[in-house]
Design a protein with these regions (language model features):
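Acidic, glycine-enriched loop/beta-strand segments at the rims
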Residues: 218, 246-249, 264-269, 277-313
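Metal-associated gating/positioning segment near the N- to mid-region
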Residues: 1-40, 59, 97, 122-128, ...
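Hydrophobic faces of well-ordered beta-strands that scaffold small-molecule active sites
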Residues: 19-21, 46-50, 88-90, 113-115, ...
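Divalent metal-binding pocket/active-site signature
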Residues: 85-134, 139, 163, 218
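Active-site mouth loops of central-metabolism enzymes
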Residues: 1-2, 58-74
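Alpha-helix-loop-beta-strand connector modules within alpha/beta enzyme cores
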Residues: 34-52, 99-118, 155-158
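Divalent metal-coordination and catalytic microenvironments
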Residues: 15, 46, 84, 106, ...
């Protein structure tokens, strides 16, 4: 948990004033949300899912509720409700039966279920009553699934940047590590570790994995375009951090990937503003209007025609207050610091 303020600063420095945390150590993220809301810690507004709901062999044991029977669901959902989560996150280990039961119990508490992936078969997953997918996914989405999503109001978060990370396509050219949204908020040792990682020659297995990641990215881009063309709510997401996916800067990269996928710049921007608010069913932000939250990003340029202009930030306004972005930059004197352990630097 060391360095949390640096991560919050990275988000704000990039103009990200609202986030959705889709899985975390619950007391930690819950307290962080509370302290930010109380004004004792500077950071973006946090929506959270708390621990994820997974099957008997959880993918992320430290942050999971292990579900092996439907009998456990009422207690788990009640705990999440008492903890004031905003949504419930269902992970890949849940069977269709358990996922259906989770949706049923969550709805009793007026909680919506976001599901991690499409692995059960997208149409079948949609029929369980979920509210959204946490990732667009790389299997090619079927016309039936698109129809069901539109009929039932099921949304999706994007996270194309994660698939780009799997392909390591972005690490072919590392100039972006010197750009302000990365360089000004990231410890130098982290950037050095990523450069070392990028320079390492891949094994045959790694080359195969990278090629597979590139195909998955291209398929996910097709899916995003189809969802947007079908007028389904698609909201920006990054799943940061992954190699080459940074908190804050990753949102700007995601917008660029969405434009590469065929969205117009304004459609891409909408995924990070209006659509994000629609995803969270919150009418107090997402568009500029009298009475809405004064969270604003003022930039130099014309992002309606050049999406990369979102990076040229003039001013960030959070809850009506202009932020001093200089104070958000990384400062080794104030950061608690920690050794890079168990990371790409050690691989």
């Amino acid at each position: 948990m060391l360095g949390y303020q640096r991560y919050l600063n990275s988000l704000l420095y990039a103009g990200v004033t609202t986030v959705l945390d889709m899985g975390n150590v619950h007391p930690y993220i819950q307290q962080l949300r509370h302290e930010i809301a109380a004004g004792r810690i500077l950071g973006p507004r946090i929506y959270l899912a708390g621990p994820v709901m997974d099957g008997p062999d959880p993918f992320w044991p430290p942050i999971s509720y292990v579900v092996s029977s439907e009998a456990q669901l009422p207690s788990y959902v009640n705990q999440l409700k008492m903890a004031r989560v905003d949504v419930v996150k269902a992970y890949v280990g849940l069977s269709e039966r358990l996922l259906t039961g989770l949706v049923r119990e969550a709805s009793k508490e007026s909680l919506r279920v976001f599901v991690h992936s499409w692995s059960l078969g997208s149409a079948d997953v949609i029929r369980t009553g979920i509210a959204a997918f946490a990732h667009v996914g790389s299997p090619l989405i079927s016309d039936e699934a698109v129809r069901l999503m539109r009929e039932r109001g099921v949304a999706s978060i994007t996270t194309l940047a994660t698939l780009e990370s799997f392909s390591q396509r972005r690490l072919d050219k590392l100039a972006f590590l010197s750009a302000p949204l990365v360089a000004q908020v990231t410890p130098p040792q982290f950037l050095a570790a990523l450069r070392t990682f990028a320079a390492k020659a891949p094994t045959p297995a790694e080359s195969t994995a990278r090629a597979r990641g590139l195909v998955q990215l291209q398929t996910a881009m097709r899916n995003v375009k189809q969802l947007v063309d079908s007028e389904i709510v698609v909201a920006v997401g990054t799943d940061a951090p992954y190699p080459g996916v940074f908190l804050g800067e990753g949102v700007h990269r995601e917008l660029e990937l969405l434009v590469e996928a065929g969205l117009t710049p304004l459609q891409a921007i909408s995924t990070a503003t209006r659509n994000a608010a629609l995803l969270m069913k919150d009418t107090t932000w997402g568009t500029i209007a009298v009475g809405k939250r004064a969270d604003l990003l003022i930039i130099n340029g014309d992002p309606a025609h050049h999406i990369a202009d979102t990076r040229d930030i003039e001013t960030v306004i959070l809850r009506g207050q202009v932020l001093n972005r200089k104070k958000l930059e990384f400062d080794p004197k104030s950061d608690p610091g920690f050794e890079i352990a168990g990371s790409i630097a050690r691989e």
